[in-house]
Amino acid sequence: MTDPNQPDKDDKTGAAGESADAPPDPATGKAAPEAGPEPGPKPGPQASATVNSLAAWQRDFWLCLGFFTRLPAKPVAGSLAEAGRAFPLAGMVVGLVGGLVYYLGFQIGLSALLAALLAVAATGIVTGALHEDGLADVCDALGARGGVAKRLEILRDSRLGSYGGLALVFATAIKVASLAALAAPELVGGALIAAHALSRGVLPLVMSRMDLARPEGLAAGAGRPSPAVAYWSLIIALVIAIIAVAPVAALVALLAALAATWLVARLAQRQFGGYTGDVLGAIEQLAEMAILINLVTLI
C-alpha cells in the first residue's frame, strides 16, 4: 500500500522527483535541475533569404494582379516597376479566365466563333479593358494632325474617336478569328495563356529602355524597372508559354511579341517622344494579336 504522505516519485515537479536521478548540488544541497531539450537549429541565412524571396514574389504577384485585373486581390504596397517580373503571372491568370469561358461555351454547344467572342469579352471584362483603352487612345492620337504636344493632349482625352473605334473593332475581330481558327478548347486555352503572358512580359523591357513621354501620368508613377526585372519578366513569360503551347511555338510567339513591341516603341518614340501608359496598352494589344496570329499557324 502506498503511503499518502509520501511524494509521488513519478511527479517531476515534486522533491522526490527532483532527487530521484539527479545528484545534489554541493553548494545548495538541492538536486540539480534536469537539462532541458536541446534547442532546435535556427534557420540559417539561406533559409531566411528563401522565405523572404517567396514573400517578395507573392507581394509582386498580388500587386500586379490588383493592377492589371478587376479580380479580388490581396492589397499590398510596393513598386509596380520592381514588381514587373510578375507581369506575366497576371497575364497568365487573364488567359486562364478566357480559356475557361471558351471551354464552358464549347461544352454547352456554342460554335467556335461565338465561344471565342465570349472568351475575348471575358478577358476584356476581367482587365477592365485597360489595354484596349490604351490602344484606342494611341490610334486616336496618331490619327490627329499636329505636333507632339497635340498628340499627348489627345492621349489624355478619354473620349473615343473614329480611329480608336476602328482599332478596337479590328483588334477584337483579329483575336476572335484567331481563337475560332484554333477551335479545340485545349488549343484555345493554351494560346490565350501564352498570348496574355507574353504580351505583358515584354512591357518591363519597354519601361526599362524607353524614355517617358511626360513626367506625370500612370507610366511615370509606375517607375522604371531594373534590367534584371525586365529579363526575369521575359524568362517567366517564355516558361509559361512553353508549358501552355509548345517550345517551338512559344519561342516564335515571343519573337512575334518582341517584333510588335519594337515597331510600336519606335513609332511612339517618334510621335510622342517616349512612352506613356496608353502606349504600353497599345504594345500589349499589338503583341497579343501578333502572338495569336502566329500560333494559328504553329499549333
Model-derived regions, located:
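Hydrophobic alpha-helical transmembrane segments
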Residues: 1-128, 149-152, 157-299
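Glycine/small-residue-rich loop that forms an oxyanion/phosphate-binding "nest" at active or ligand-binding sites
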Residues: 133-136, 140-144, 152-153
